Protein backbone atom coordinates (compact mmCIF):
# COMPACT_ATOMS: atom_id res chain seq x y z
CA UNK A 1 0.00 0.00 0.00
CA UNK A 2 1.32 3.38 -0.95
CA UNK A 3 0.12 6.54 0.63
CA UNK A 4 0.99 10.14 1.22
CA UNK A 5 -0.20 11.87 4.40
CA UNK A 6 1.33 15.35 4.22
CA UNK A 7 -0.49 17.93 6.31
CA UNK A 8 -2.46 20.96 5.20
CA UNK A 9 -5.71 22.73 6.07
CA UNK A 10 -8.26 24.08 3.63
CA UNK A 11 -6.62 27.51 3.84
CA UNK A 12 -2.94 26.57 3.68
CA UNK A 13 -2.73 23.53 1.39
CA UNK A 14 -0.75 24.50 -1.71
CA UNK A 15 -2.17 23.28 -5.02
CA UNK A 16 1.09 21.36 -5.60
CA UNK A 17 0.50 19.37 -2.39
CA UNK A 18 -3.15 18.79 -3.33
CA UNK A 19 -2.06 17.45 -6.73
CA UNK A 20 0.65 15.24 -5.19
CA UNK A 21 -1.82 13.77 -2.67
CA UNK A 22 -4.30 12.96 -5.43
CA UNK A 23 -1.54 11.53 -7.64
CA UNK A 24 -0.41 9.08 -4.96
CA UNK A 25 -3.67 8.35 -3.13
CA UNK A 26 -6.21 8.32 -5.98
CA UNK A 27 -4.55 8.31 -9.42
CA UNK A 28 -1.97 5.58 -8.69
CA UNK A 29 -4.55 3.14 -7.27
CA UNK A 30 -6.81 3.90 -10.26
CA UNK A 31 -4.02 3.02 -12.70
CA UNK A 32 -3.11 -0.14 -10.78
CA UNK A 33 -6.73 -1.28 -10.58
CA UNK A 34 -7.19 -0.58 -14.28
CA UNK A 35 -4.28 -2.84 -15.19
CA UNK A 36 -5.32 -5.60 -12.78
CA UNK A 37 -8.89 -5.60 -14.11
CA UNK A 38 -7.71 -5.65 -17.72
CA UNK A 39 -5.35 -8.54 -16.97
CA UNK A 40 -7.98 -10.57 -15.13
CA UNK A 41 -10.54 -10.06 -17.87
CA UNK A 42 -8.04 -10.95 -20.60
CA UNK A 43 -7.26 -14.17 -18.73
CA UNK A 44 -10.94 -14.85 -18.09
CA UNK A 45 -10.32 -15.12 -14.35
CA UNK A 46 -12.13 -13.77 -11.30
CA UNK A 47 -10.12 -11.77 -8.80
CA UNK A 48 -10.03 -9.50 -5.80
CA UNK A 49 -8.62 -6.07 -5.11
CA UNK A 50 -8.20 -4.49 -1.67
CA UNK A 51 -7.57 -0.78 -1.38
CA UNK A 52 -6.03 0.58 1.82
CA UNK A 53 -7.93 3.77 2.48
CA UNK A 54 -8.23 5.58 5.85
CA UNK A 55 -10.72 6.55 8.50
CA UNK A 56 -10.01 10.11 7.35
CA UNK A 57 -11.97 9.33 4.17
CA UNK A 58 -15.06 9.97 6.33
CA UNK A 59 -13.98 13.60 6.75
CA UNK A 60 -10.68 13.70 8.62
CA UNK A 61 -9.03 16.25 10.85
CA UNK A 62 -8.80 19.87 9.67
CA UNK A 63 -5.04 19.53 9.09
CA UNK A 64 -5.60 16.60 6.69
CA UNK A 65 -7.79 18.33 4.11
CA UNK A 66 -6.06 17.14 0.94
CA UNK A 67 -5.26 13.72 2.37
CA UNK A 68 -8.86 13.17 3.46
CA UNK A 69 -10.23 14.33 0.11
CA UNK A 70 -7.83 12.11 -1.86
CA UNK A 71 -8.66 9.06 0.23
CA UNK A 72 -12.36 9.91 -0.02
CA UNK A 73 -11.89 9.76 -3.78
CA UNK A 74 -10.30 6.32 -3.41
CA UNK A 75 -13.26 5.16 -1.29
CA UNK A 76 -15.65 6.27 -4.03
CA UNK A 77 -13.48 4.64 -6.70
CA UNK A 78 -13.50 1.41 -4.68
CA UNK A 79 -17.31 1.32 -4.58
CA UNK A 80 -17.59 2.33 -8.25
CA UNK A 81 -15.15 -0.36 -9.39
CA UNK A 82 -16.87 -2.98 -7.22
CA UNK A 83 -20.16 -2.24 -8.92
CA UNK A 84 -18.66 -2.03 -12.40
CA UNK A 85 -16.63 -5.23 -12.23
CA UNK A 86 -18.91 -7.58 -10.29
CA UNK A 87 -20.28 -9.17 -13.47
CA UNK A 88 -16.68 -10.20 -14.27
CA UNK A 89 -16.48 -11.64 -10.74
CA UNK A 90 -13.81 -9.15 -9.77
CA UNK A 91 -14.34 -8.05 -6.19
CA UNK A 92 -13.14 -4.67 -4.93
CA UNK A 93 -13.15 -3.80 -1.23
CA UNK A 94 -11.42 -1.25 0.97
CA UNK A 95 -9.98 -0.99 4.45
CA UNK A 96 -10.41 2.34 6.24
CA UNK A 97 -7.35 2.20 8.45
CA UNK A 98 -7.21 4.08 11.75
CA UNK A 99 -4.15 5.56 13.44
CA UNK A 100 -1.33 3.12 12.75
CA UNK A 101 2.25 2.62 13.88
CA UNK A 102 4.02 2.71 10.53
CA UNK A 103 7.31 4.15 9.26
CA UNK A 104 5.30 6.82 7.46
CA UNK A 105 3.59 7.86 10.69
CA UNK A 106 6.94 8.05 12.47
CA UNK A 107 8.25 10.31 9.68
CA UNK A 108 5.20 12.58 9.88
CA UNK A 109 5.49 12.81 13.67
CA UNK A 110 9.18 13.75 13.39
CA UNK A 111 8.41 16.32 10.69
CA UNK A 112 5.68 17.80 12.91
CA UNK A 113 8.16 18.14 15.79
CA UNK A 114 6.84 15.35 18.01
CA UNK A 115 9.31 14.16 20.65
CA UNK A 116 11.14 10.88 19.99
CA UNK A 117 8.95 9.12 22.58
CA UNK A 118 5.67 10.23 20.96
CA UNK A 119 4.54 6.62 20.43
CA UNK A 120 5.03 5.61 24.07
CA UNK A 121 2.88 8.62 25.02
CA UNK A 122 0.20 8.12 22.36
CA UNK A 123 -0.24 4.35 22.70
CA UNK A 124 -1.67 4.24 26.26
CA UNK A 125 -4.23 6.88 25.31
CA UNK A 126 -5.77 4.60 22.67
CA UNK A 127 -8.79 2.47 23.64
CA UNK A 128 -6.82 -0.79 23.24
CA UNK A 129 -3.54 0.60 24.56
CA UNK A 130 -1.59 0.86 21.32
CA UNK A 131 -1.74 2.07 17.74
CA UNK A 132 -2.76 -0.31 14.97
CA UNK A 133 0.17 -2.26 13.54
CA UNK A 134 0.50 -3.62 10.00
CA UNK A 135 0.18 -7.19 11.32
CA UNK A 136 -3.27 -6.30 12.68
CA UNK A 137 -4.53 -5.39 9.22
CA UNK A 138 -2.82 -8.21 7.32
CA UNK A 139 -5.40 -10.79 8.38
CA UNK A 140 -8.29 -8.69 7.12
CA UNK A 141 -6.56 -8.03 3.80
CA UNK A 142 -5.83 -11.74 3.38
CA UNK A 143 -9.46 -12.56 4.15
CA UNK A 144 -10.75 -10.02 1.63
CA UNK A 145 -8.47 -11.45 -1.05
CA UNK A 146 -9.42 -15.05 -0.27
CA UNK A 147 -12.27 -17.23 -1.45
CA UNK A 148 -13.76 -16.94 2.05
CA UNK A 149 -14.90 -13.44 1.01
CA UNK A 150 -16.06 -14.45 -2.47
CA UNK A 151 -19.54 -13.00 -1.92
CA UNK A 152 -18.27 -9.64 -0.68
CA UNK A 153 -17.64 -6.62 -2.89
CA UNK A 154 -17.94 -2.88 -2.43
CA UNK A 155 -17.32 -3.04 1.31
CA UNK A 156 -15.43 -0.25 3.05
CA UNK A 157 -14.43 -1.70 6.40
CA UNK A 158 -13.55 0.66 9.25
CA UNK A 159 -10.50 -0.85 10.95
CA UNK A 160 -10.14 1.39 13.97
CA UNK A 161 -10.32 1.51 17.76
CA UNK A 162 -12.92 4.26 17.67
CA UNK A 163 -16.51 4.25 16.49
CA UNK A 164 -17.56 7.07 14.17
CA UNK A 165 -20.50 8.98 15.57
CA UNK A 166 -20.16 7.55 19.09
CA UNK A 167 -19.35 10.15 21.72
CA UNK A 168 -18.80 10.08 25.46
For each predicted feature, which ranges?
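Substrate-binding pocket helix/loop in short-chain dehydrogenase/reductase
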Residues: 9-10, 17-19, 122
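Short, small/polar-rich loop/turn modules that mediate ligand/substrate recognition or access, typified
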Residues: 86, 91, 152-154
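Alpha-helical segment proximal to the catalytic Tyr-Lys
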Residues: 38, 83-84, 150
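Short C-terminal tail/terminal secondary-structure segment
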Residues: 59, 142, 153-168
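Active-site helix of classical SDR
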Residues: 33, 70
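Residue(s) in the substrate-gating loop at a strand-loop-helix junction
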Residues: 54
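Active-site loop immediately N-terminal to the catalytic Tyr-X3-Lys motif
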Residues: 11, 59-65, 87, 129, ...
Amino acid sequence: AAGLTDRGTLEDTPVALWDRLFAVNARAPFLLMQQVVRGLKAAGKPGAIVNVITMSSHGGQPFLTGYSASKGALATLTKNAAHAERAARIRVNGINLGWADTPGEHAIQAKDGAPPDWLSRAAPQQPFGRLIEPRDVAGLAIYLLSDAAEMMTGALIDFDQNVIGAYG
